[in-house]
Swiss-Prot record:
It catalyses: tRNA(Tyr) + L-tyrosine + ATP = L-tyrosyl-tRNA(Tyr) + AMP + diphosphate + H(+). This is Tyrosine--tRNA ligase. A motif ('KMSKS' region) lies at residues 231-235. It comes from Lactobacillus helveticus (strain DPC 4571). Gene3D superfamilies: HUPs, RNA-binding S4 domain, Tyrosyl-Transfer RNA Synthetase. Homodimer. It is found in: Cytoplasm. GO terms for cellular component: cytosol. Residues 353-419 form the S4 RNA-binding domain. The lineage of its organism: Bacteria, Bacillati, Bacillota, Bacilli, Lactobacillales.
Length: 420
């Protein structure tokens, strides 16, 4: 049986930007079944967002093809900060912040990668033991300052200034690759396009210390841009986080289901674990029947299930279906808060109030005349029920959990009214 060509699959998915030695890597994959690869992330926050997820999708694909992924948590480098992609110096974190973030990221990675054929390492294990004299003697002599300055990550910062701390980051990342290659048999490093200089520095160090024939490869992924030219990964509300406390499964699902037709096939190739045939079928449906949004729905299903599990996906779909149909009575308060987090909101007192006055006082309607007209025309719903009587009283005692009255105007214009 022919071995699955992981590199060819990644190329078809548009997931490869640069490779240090494509021929050498292909040869290694053809002759060995034991490839180990890694991608690092510094614990600068307590959650990854979907922009961070991009390189780890590549690791996941290698894992599914039978190879051994290693996630490197930068407990050592995270105390310094990667200058890549930044115009200014990072604010240094406390040891307690770094430790807390390490624990959070480790838990997220375990959810994504499981427990088999996968490991998490922390570069504090070796960098934390490295003293200054050993650093300069054993590693510093292999790095030429003129070469370091010419690397894009440093060159882009020279005009505004870069500290010695961040300047040496590429050496520390090179030591990481060297350590994992020598002691753990890791041959391939994956990173974003801005990591090219750091990756090649690591390969150079490995070859200088272990010999030019030592297998060591690098692969970077392209910068992902939307069809409008803006950077992928942000919603109107900011970053889309993997932590359900920061971005609920519903919000996460909505981010994917609202993707542009021009982008959705690209994202399916990258983020969904679907075959070429399935993706090509969805691409055809998008071209012929874009209004059905079949590709967006499948994309949202696949990525939400990967990050939040089957339960998270089902909850996101339940909230979506309820808000779309207007049948909101079976939603819990938590689900209502998720689904209407970004909807218009208002406050009202705890006393009964005529619906016309309620709509005007909460600024859902601009005037009593307009309120009466919309009520009579059947455009107003209170807690899921259509109300067509101008004499109807809104009773806060029937609010969801005694807390919320939900007004829908028209098909899907919701307002969340909090009872005070």
């Amino acid at each position: 049986m022919a071995k699955f060509d992981i590199l060819e699959d990644l190329k078809w998915r548009g997931a490869i930007n640069q490779e240090t030695d494509e021929e050498g890597l292909r040869k290694y994959l053809a002759e060995h079944d034991d490839l180990a690869l890694y991608c690092g992330t510094d614990p600068t926050g307590d959650s990854l967002h979907i922009g961070h997820l991009i390189p780890f999708m590549i690791l996941k694909r290698f894992q599914m093809a039978g190879y051994h992924p290693v996630i490197l948590i930068g407990g050592g480098t995270g105390a310094i900060g990667d200058p890549s992609g930044r115009k200014t110096e990072r604010t240094l974190q406390t040891a307690d912040q770094v430790k807390h973030n390490e624990e959070c990221l480790t838990n997220q990675m375990k959810k994504l990668f499981g427990t088999e054929n996968f490991e998490i390492r922390n570069n504090a294990e070796w960098l934390g033991k490295l003293n200054l004299i050993d650093f300069l003697r054993d590693y510093g002599k292999f790095f030429q300052v003129n070469n370091m300055i010419n690397k894009e990550v440093v060159a882009s910062r020279l005009e505004n200034g870069i500290s010695f701390t961040e300047f040496t980051y590429q050496i520390l990342q090179a030591i990481d690759f060297y350590h994992l290659n020598k002691d753990d048999g890791v041959q391939l490093q994956i990173g974003g396009s801005d990591q090219w200089g750091n990756i090649t520095a690591g390969i150079d160090l490995i070859h200088k210390l272990e010999g030019a024939d030592r297998p060591a490869f690098g692969l970077t992924i392209p910068l992902m841009l939307k069809a409008d030219g803006t950077k992928f990964g942000k919603s109107a509300g900011g970053a889309v986080w993997l932590d359900p406390e920061k971005t609920s499964p519903y919000e996460f699902y909505q981010f994917w289901i609202n993707q542009d037709d021009r982008d959705v096939v690209k994202y399916l190739k990258y983020f969904a674990f679907l075959s070429r045939e399935e993706i090509e079928d969805l691409a055809e449906k998008t071209e012929k029947e874009p209004w059905k949004r079949a590709a967006q729905k499948r994309l949202a299903e696949e990525v939400t299930k990967f990050v939040h599990g089957e339960a998270g996906l089902k909850e996101a779909q339940m909230i979506t279906d309820a808000l779309f149909s207007g049948n909101i009575k079976n939603l819990s308060v938590t689900q209502i808060e998720q689904g209407l987090k970004n909807a218009p909101s208002a406050e009202a007192g705890s006393e009964k109030k005529n619906l016309v006055d309620f709509l005007v006082d909460t600024k859902i309607e601009p005037s009593k005349r307009q309120a009466r007209e919309d009520i009579k025309n059947g455009a107003i719903y209170v807690n899921g029920d259509r109300e067509q009587s101008v004499d109807f009283d809104v009773d806060p005692s029937s609010a969801f959990d005694g807390k919320y009255v939900i007004i829908r105007k028209g098909k899907r214009k919701y307002t969340l009214v909090t009872i005070k």
